[in-house]
UniProtKB/Swiss-Prot annotation:
GO MF term (any one): structural constituent of ribosome
One term under GO cellular component: ribonucleoprotein complex
Highest classification ranks of the organism: Bacteria, Pseudomonadati, Pseudomonadota, Gammaproteobacteria, Moraxellales
Gene name per UniProt: rpmJ
Name of the protein in its database record: Large ribosomal subunit protein bL36
PROSITE patterns, alphabetized: RIBOSOMAL_L36 (PS00828)
Family: Belongs to the bacterial ribosomal protein bL36 family.
Keyword ATP-binding annotated: no
NCBIfam families xrefs: rpmJ_bact (TIGR01022)
Length: 38
């Protein structure tokens, strides 16, 4: 999981979601694409 100031989709499978006020990117195709804004 990368913690970034700015999160963006890296591939077509990435989804931007909001959990408990934190913006996250989850990706089923490539788990290395997981990101969290912080």
């Amino acid at each position: 999981m990368k913690v970034q100031a700015s999160v963006k989709k890296i591939c077509g499978s990435c989804k931007v979601i909001r959990r408990n006020g934190v913006i996250r990117v989850i990706c089923s195709a490539e788990p290395r694409h997981k990101q969290r804004q912080g």
